[in-house]
Swiss-Prot record:
Keywords: Ribonucleoprotein, Ribosomal protein. One of its GO terms (cellular component) is cytosolic large ribosomal subunit. Gene3D superfamilies: Ribosomal protein l15e. It comes from Methanococcus maripaludis (strain C6 / ATCC BAA-1332). InterPro entries: Rbsml_eL15_core_dom_sf, Ribosomal_eL15, Ribosomal_eL15_arc, Ribosomal_eL15_CS, Ribosomal_uL23/eL15/eS24_sf. PROSITE patterns: RIBOSOMAL_L15E. It holds the Pfam family Ribosomal_L15e. It comes from the Archaea. The keyword Nucleus does not apply. PANTHER family: LARGE RIBOSOMAL SUBUNIT PROTEIN EL15, RIBOSOMAL PROTEIN L15. This is Large ribosomal subunit protein eL15. One of its GO terms (biological process) is cytoplasmic translation.
Amino acid sequence: MSMYNYVKEAWKVPANSYVKELQWSRMQDWRKEPSVIRVERPTRIDRARNLGYKAKQGIVVVRVSVRRGGLRKPRPKHSKKPSTLGINKITMAKSIQRIAEERAAKKYPNLEVLNSYWVGQDGKQKWYEVILVDSCHPSIKSDKSYNWLCKGTHKGRATRGLTSAGKKGRGLMYKGKGAEKVRPSVRANSKKAK
């Protein structure tokens, strides 16, 4: 079994392997860091490489922390009946992973989101590592596995829901029975898909 398979097996159920102690010590530092921070190398090398990461110029890994649970809505200033306030029990139509990708893209506007993966969570927040690519870098333009990102059609792909997490949230991972209303888009079908 290769080294990557050992790492993959350990991360399948972190609570049953050495990953539990690693996460416990790492999260103490992560909580003190800003919500979006660039990291030198991926925490999960097996997952990162599986999603397209290579240790080369023009590719950056960023760790993003996002709150857990439902949407945190501000309380209306003017008085309302409690039943119509609309603060509690409101769930975002986007996944937390998708929010993490969008925040990373906003922090680094010259880079495009390639993919992302989960690295940890506690009671209050989740951490994701986002792989970003500089589409104007010469080493990316000359690499056949990345130069498709240099086309203008992929600009702002995280905010347009074109990443893997974005497509999953839009229901585009499914086809056939039960997926009749997800194409061409959720809004085109009057939001009947959600």
